[in-house]
């Protein structure tokens, strides 16, 4: 089974360049603006989109993404409405891979089986669930794969060669390498350390390796894209989004253009990396 993720990475490989992966929280700052933002991402140069599922206790998220989740929850965003957002996006874009990222609890409450049916029908391509280790694969990972979704696993600087095979066993789509330890948005990614880590992971898997956490500038994105199959940017986009809001935390006329402009400049960094590496 070839998924949208498989097709996108295959196309990018032919072009000799890395994927630019963007993250935004569903429903931030409201559902209408969230849809406009998602629609603007591919036009600005995003190859793959990660959509955050808002949750009340996001333990791996830094202040920017926590605040985004709170804004989304305040705007009434639920998992059901997140899937409706995906469905609305898919009306005009059937090619861009969409990956839902977040925590297991909202899916557990929704019900694993109905969630997987609804997610697949809406046009979701993959899941990144940060608080489900491989030991819990029977909970969601294996049913997700059976439903035709990619299950993307996180690897970190502390995931050693002994642990990696377990982490990678049921992973598909791509491997998400968290380049810095700690919460999102906290530190900058180091290109030489990333290069060594990507090489090490690739000894264990043929899957593409995307690198996230700590990428904030076009130069940083370019440096990572030289060594990885994809560069993921989230906190930097959420920061720009939050700075564009009014005093009440509502969207302004500047919100979508501000995010799209940053995406375009980061995309130029990622997409220019192939030429730098050749």
UniProtKB/Swiss-Prot annotation:
UniProt pathway annotation: Amino-acid biosynthesis; L-tryptophan biosynthesis; L-tryptophan from chorismate: step 5/5
One function term, GO molecular function aspect: tryptophan synthase activity
Catalytic reactions on record: (1S,2R)-1-C-(indol-3-yl)glycerol 3-phosphate + L-serine = D-glyceraldehyde 3-phosphate + L-tryptophan + H2O
Active site: 50, 61
SUPFAM superfamilies from the UniProt entry: Ribulose-phoshate binding barrel (SSF51366)
InterPro entries the record matches: Aldolase_TIM, RibuloseP-bd_barrel, Trp_synthase_alpha_AS, Trp_synthase_suA
The organism's place on the tree of life at top rank: Bacteria
Alphabetical keyword list: Amino-acid biosynthesis, Aromatic amino acid biosynthesis, Lyase, Tryptophan biosynthesis
GO cellular component: cytosol
EC number per UniProt: 4.2.1.20
Top EC class, one word: lyase
Entry's family note: Belongs to the TrpA family.
Quaternary structure (record): Tetramer of two alpha and two beta chains.
Function: The alpha subunit is responsible for the aldol cleavage of indoleglycerol phosphate to indole and glyceraldehyde 3-phosphate.
Name of the protein this chain belongs to: Tryptophan synthase alpha chain
């Amino acid at each position: 089974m070839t998924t949208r993720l498989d097709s996108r990475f295959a196309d990018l490989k032919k072009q000799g360049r890395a994927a630019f992966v963007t993250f935004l929280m569903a429903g931030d700052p409201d559902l209408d603006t969230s849809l406009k933002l998602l629609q603007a991402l591919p036009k600005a140069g995003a190859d793959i989109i990660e959509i955050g599922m808002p949750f009340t206790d996001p333990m791996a998220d830094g202040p920017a993404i926590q605040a985004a989740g709170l804004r989304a929850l305040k705007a009434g965003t639920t998992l059901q409405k997140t899937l409706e957002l995906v469905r609305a996006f898919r009306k005009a874009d059937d090619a861009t891979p969409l990956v839902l990222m977040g925590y297991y609890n909202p899916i557990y409450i929704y019900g694993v089986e109905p969630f997987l049916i609804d997610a697949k029908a809406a046009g979701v391509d993959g899941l990144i669930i940060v608080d489900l280790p491989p030991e819990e694969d029977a909970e969601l990972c294996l049913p997700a794969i059976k439903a035709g979704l990619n299950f993307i696993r996180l690897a970190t600087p502390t995931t050693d060669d002994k642990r990696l095979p377990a982490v990678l066993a049921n992973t598909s789509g791509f491997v998400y390498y968290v380049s810095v330890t700690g919460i999102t948005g906290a530190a900058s990614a180091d290109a030489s350390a990333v290069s060594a880590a990507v090489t090490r992971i690739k000894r264990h898997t043929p899957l593409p390796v995307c690198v996230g956490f700590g990428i904030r500038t076009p130069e940083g994105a370019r440096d990572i894209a030289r060594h990885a199959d994809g560069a993921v940017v989230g906190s930097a986009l959420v920061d720009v989004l939050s700075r564009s809001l009014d005093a009440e935390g509502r969207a302004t006329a500047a919100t979508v253009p501000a995010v799209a402009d940053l995406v375009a400049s980061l995309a130029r960094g990622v997409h220019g990396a192939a030429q730098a590496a050749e």
